[in-house]
Swiss-Prot record:
Organism (species): Xenopus laevis
SUPFAM superfamilies: Eukaryotic type KH-domain (KH-domain type I), RNA-binding domain, RBD
Quaternary structure note: Homodimer and multimer. Associates with microtubules. Interaction with a translocation machinery protein TRAPA of the endoplasmic reticulum. Component of a mRNP complex, at least composed of DAZAP1, IGF2BP3, STAU and VgRBP60. The mRNP complex with DAZAP1, IGF2BP3, STAU and VgRBP60 is only found in the cytoplasm. Interacts with a hnRNP 1 related RNA transport protein VgRBP60 both in the nucleus (in an RNA-independent manner) and the cytoplasm (in an RNA-dependent manner). Found in a B3 activator complex.
Gene coding for it: igf2bp3-b
Phylogenetic lineage: Eukaryota, Metazoa, Chordata, Craniata, Vertebrata
Family to which this protein belongs: Belongs to the RRM IMP/VICKZ family.
Domain KH: 204-269, 285-352, 417-482, 499-565
Biological processes, Gene Ontology terms: CRD-mediated mRNA stabilization; mRNA transport; nervous system development; regulation of translation
Record protein name field: Insulin-like growth factor 2 mRNA-binding protein 3-B
Cellular localization per UniProt: Nucleus; Cytoplasm; Endoplasmic reticulum
Keywords on record: Cytoplasm, Developmental protein, DNA-binding, Endoplasmic reticulum, mRNA transport, Nucleus, Repeat, RNA-binding, Transcription, Transcription regulation, Translation regulation, Transport
Keyword Cell membrane: no
């Protein structure tokens, strides 16, 4: 996304005019300006500079009497599901933006882009081309808290080329402000980004590094020359987040490439930092710092630290990991610090990232398998998988994620609270609670649920009961994190599925509805969800006239079974209310068949 389209140009504009404009604005460019009638194209060194050009020039600079517009250049066949929305009010709540985007279709992914501007920028992926077209049409120029939104297409590498007949059938768009529409720029010329691009493999996990701020200039080089050379040498895309955490001693770098490309770029960056340190007489050690989502760190460390110790021994390095207490809901990454020579650190990076990629692929495989079973829940928003803001590819890259506006309850309605008893290995209680209760408190805040661990039933009890109280989405978040934590901390083997038993209480009069005639309903539940569902016979109802339903299975199976049982209970309650109303009105009740 480093290629720019410059529109609304006067007929008199020449390449030297545009070169002068970019130089005055201190925006580097590569190659020549390709000027057409009323518009032009140019390449920037990287995506960061392209965004800088858009923020600095678009709608703000006049050239030969016309205010120019600058945006990402998108080949026609890649104008599909992906949009970039700029000029978003800086303090806007995510829920407000999500609900606005959902008005025009199903949103599969929404990620914030780091820019120099005060306003926010997001990249949005809709479920299909028509939803994206509606979003572009309705949101471009939309007034939100006195800010006018600016919406453009960005390349969708997963888009399938249209047949000539489809292209003829599709009407060309007219931009609301009257300039050349997106459908009127003609075909992408040779060399357009993505002209021969293939979809990225889903398993591509970027490498995230932290580097001392004083070395960022050396890594970029004069007018971006050094970073440009690194990207060419290693066939990678490198984002240096210079504006993140203003004044911080370290800045994050995200490297997108194959595992080999990421490792090669990492090694070159370490060499540049070492040379710059020598030139500036910087005497402190410069360790390699890798950022990794907390979801993967437990598996990287391994039981009793075995995995990490092996990497240290094999690579002759010293590796430490930042404490859990440093995590927040907004920063779910931990810092893996590797000390050693450049050669040994490079080897350690390969081994660390290999483990992280394996963990990521296992999680995505589980999500691919079961995501379609739970409609109406926003899987991307639940935090069970790494958010794309931390540099991880969003799960929606390979999943038809059921993210819809149904993820939010109707305005004015509060979803009913539920209580679930989840049974975990007794040995895992310490991991769930965390040091001084930090983990369970953070989990409770994250999920929006009450989470308590019941006392052990006896000194030899192998299981402990976790009592989770909250609405459906809070249950999903809390239980999902508990399943994930047990896997991370190796309470289950690397190829073993985490299966837990959950108990939910139902009114005794509704137990028959859960079982169904001759066990039909409970059998259908088991076939649909892959969970084992048991309503023990001859139970004595408790003081609240409730009996227990036992559900055993992996996370998604258990969740689907819980939701289906809650649907049955809601149906029973509605029928009861209807019967009460009918009885009060004195009308005869219809007989149940």
């Amino acid at each position: 996304m480093n290629k720019l389209y410059i529109g609304n140009l006067s007929e008199n504009v020449s390449p030297p005019d545009l070169e002068s404009l970019f130089k005055e604005s201190k925006i580097p460019f590569t190659g020549q300006f390709l000027v057409k009638s009323g518009y032009a194209f140019v390449d920037c060194p990287d995506e960061t500079w392209a965004m800088k050009a858009i923020d600095t020039l678009s709608g703000k600079v006049e050239l030969h009497g016309k205010v120019i517009e600058v945006e990402h250049s998108v080949p026609k066949r890649q104008r599909s599901r992906k949009l970039q929305i700029r000029n978003i009010p800086p303090h806007l709540q995510w829920e407000v933006l999500d609900s606005l985007l959902a008005q025009y279709g199903t949103v599969e992914n929404c990620e914030q882009v780091n820019t120099d501007s005060e306003t926010a920028v997001v990249n949005v992926t809709y479920a299909n081309k028509e939803h994206a077209r509606q979003g572009l049409e309705k949101l471009n120029g939309y007034q939100l808290e006195n800010y006018s939104l600016k919406v453009t297409y960005i390349p969708d590498e997963m888009a399938t080329p249209q047949s000539p007949s489809q292209q003829l059938q599709q009407p060309q768009q007219q931009h609301p402000q009257g300039r050349r529409g997106f459908g009127q720029r003609g075909p992408a010329r040779q060399g357009s980004p993505g002209a021969a691009a293939r979809p990225k493999p889903q398993s591509e996990v970027p490498l995230r590094m932290l580097v001392p701020t004083q070395f960022v200039g050396a890594i970029i080089g004069k007018e971006g020359a050094t970073i440009r050379n690194i990207t060419k040498q290693t066939q990678s895309k490198i984002d240096i987040h210079r504006k993140e955490n203003a004044g911080a001693a370290e800045k994050p770098i995200t490297i997108h490439s194959t595992p080999e490309g990421c490792s090669a770029a990492c090694k070159i960056i370490m060499e540049i930092m070492q040379k710059e340190a020598q030139d500036t007489k910087f005497t402190e050690e410069i360790p390699l710092k890798i950022l990794a989502h907390n979801n993967f760190v437990g598996r990287l460390i391994g039981k009793e630290g075995r995995n990490l110790k092996k990497i240290e021994q094999d690579t002759d390095t010293k590796i430490t990991i930042s404490p859990l207490q440093d995590l927040t809901l907004y920063n779910p990454e931990r810092t893996i610090t590797v000390k050693g020579s450049i050669e040994t650190c490079a080897k350690a990076e390969e081994e660390v990232m290999k483990k992280i990629r394996e963990s990521y692929e296992n999680d995505i495989a589980a999500m691919n398998l079961q995501a379609h079973l739970i409609p109406g829940l926003n899987l991307n928003a639940l935090g069970l998988f790494p958010p794309s803001s931390s540099g991880m590819p969003p799960p929606s890259a390979g999943v038809s994620s059921p993210t819809t506006s149904a993820s939010y309850p109707p305005f004015g309605q509060q979803p009913e609270s539920e209580t679930v008893h989840l049974f975990i290995p007794a040995l895992a209680v310490g991991a769930i609670i965390g040091k001084q209760g930090q983990h369970i408190k953070q989990l409770s805040r994250f999920a929006g649920a009450s989470i308590k661990i019941a006392p052990a039933e006896g000194p030899d009890a192998k299981l402990r009961m976790v009592i989770i109280t909250g609405p459906p989405e809070a249950q999903f978040k809390a239980q999902g994190r508990i399943y994930g934590k047990l896997k991370e901390e190796n309470f289950f083997g690397p190829k073993e599925e985490v299966k837990l038993e959950a108990h939910i209480k139902v009114p005794s009069y509704a137990a028959g509805r859960v079982i169904g005639k001759g066990g039909k309903t409970v059998n259908e539940l088991q076939n649909l969800t892959s969970a084992e569902v048991v309503v023990p016979r001859d139970q004595t109802p408790d003081e609240n006239d409730q009996v227990v339903v036992k559900i055993t299975g992996h996370f998604y199976a258990s969740q689907l079974a819980q939701r289906k049982i809650q649907e049955i209970l809601a149906q029973v309650r509605r029928q009861q209310q209807q019967q009460q109303k009918t009885a009060q009105s004195g009308q005869p009740q219809p007989r149940r068949k």
